Structures are given as structure tokens and as C-alpha cells.
Amino acid sequence: MRSHSITRSTAETDIEVSVQLDGTGRYDNQTGVGFFDHMLDQLARHSLIDLSVRAKGDLHVDDHHTVEDTGIALGQALAGALGDKRGIVRYGSCLLPMDDALVRCALDLSARPYLIWNVDMPTAKIGTFDTELVREFFTALATHGGITLHIDLLHGINSHHIAEATFKSVARALRQAVETDPRKSDAIPSTKGAL
């Protein structure tokens, strides 16, 4: 079973994340940030990665530490579940529409973290959620998951739709990348022999 759990405790947050790569997209996410929970649910459902997040953060300050630290812990959990990455497809991409929004994601589970972010949100908030935190989450996820991650907004006028299409696009790309390659199930997907 390709699964992993992470517990991360700082002066700002206490976070527990569990992932099961060969799941069905089950989720149980409780961060105290409603919109963010909704996005994490989308990430699980569309990647088919079972995901459980328990986060307690300094929400009296703002949502930033909770969202960013969840990204850190989730990245670490994904990296742990992937292990040496033997047999995975490694790459994934998705062009995902949601009403007015069209988001493209391409990723490589390369152990070389990098984020290219071409997403402009038209509003500063979605309800009470700061839209700039979407980028903070994916920066943390890519950095601590060892993911080369390109996300581009091609069209969009509604911030909620843009954010949701972004999470769903990344989820669908992850779904492809973490799959076991039936033709190379015993091989590291690199000519270097390691990732």
C-alpha cells in the first residue's frame, strides 16, 4: 500500500496529514478554513488519492499559516508515499474547464521542486478566504513534495471557479503521475536510475 502520514507541529500550527495513493478519492479534511477544506476535498476526489487532514492553526491571526503548513505536510506525505518512485508514470497533465475558467496543469514528480504560476485572481477574497493563499499552498506542495509544477490560467473571470479549476487540474494531473506504469512497474522512471 502506497500510503504515508505526517504530523507537523510548530508554534503556529498542528497538522496531521494522511494519504493513500491507491485510493478512491475519499476525504476527511478539517482545517478550520471552510473554502480551503472544499478545495482539499476536490483535490482528493479528482486525484483518487484518499486524503485526511486535521489542522489547528492560529486562525485568529489569519489563514496563511494553516494553508501553507498544510501544503508543506501534504507535500511531505505525498513524497513519503511515493518512496523511490519505482514504477510510477511520473508525469501528468490536465486542461480543465469550470464554467468561465480554463486551467492547465503539467507536473513532474521529479524531486526537483519548481513552481511556475500564471494565475491571476480577479478578486482578493473568495468569501473570507484570501485568494493569494492558493499560490502559497501550491508553492509549499511543490517544494516539499519534490514536484515540478506548472499552472496556467487560460481564461477566467470568477475567482471561485479559477481556484477550484486549479485544484481540480492539479488533482487530475497527480492522478496520472502517481499511477503505476504496467509496462515499467519495477523501474525508476529516469535514465539516471534515481529520482
UniProtKB/Swiss-Prot annotation:
Catalytic activity: D-erythro-1-(imidazol-4-yl)glycerol 3-phosphate = 3-(imidazol-4-yl)-2-oxopropyl phosphate + H2O
Keywords associated with the record: Amino-acid biosynthesis, Cytoplasm, Histidine biosynthesis, Lyase
Coiled-coil regions listed in the entry: none
One Pfam family cited in the UniProt record for this chain: IGPD
CDD domains according to UniProt: IGPD
Top EC class of this enzyme: lyase
Transmembrane segment boundaries: none
GO molecular function: imidazoleglycerol-phosphate dehydratase activity
Lineage, top ranks: Bacteria, Pseudomonadati, Pseudomonadota, Alphaproteobacteria, Rhodobacterales
Subcellular location as annotated: Cytoplasm
Matches recorded under Gene3D superfamilies: Imidazole glycerol phosphate dehydratase, domain 1 (3.30.230.40)
Sequence similarity: Belongs to the imidazoleglycerol-phosphate dehydratase family.
Pathway: Amino-acid biosynthesis; L-histidine biosynthesis; L-histidine from 5-phospho-alpha-D-ribose 1-diphosphate: step 6/9
Protein name as catalogued: Imidazoleglycerol-phosphate dehydratase
Listed SUPFAM superfamilies: Ribosomal protein S5 domain 2-like
Listed EC numbers: 4.2.1.19
Superkingdom, natural source: Bacteria
Keyword set includes Lyase: yes
GO cellular component: cytoplasm
GO biological process: L-histidine biosynthetic process
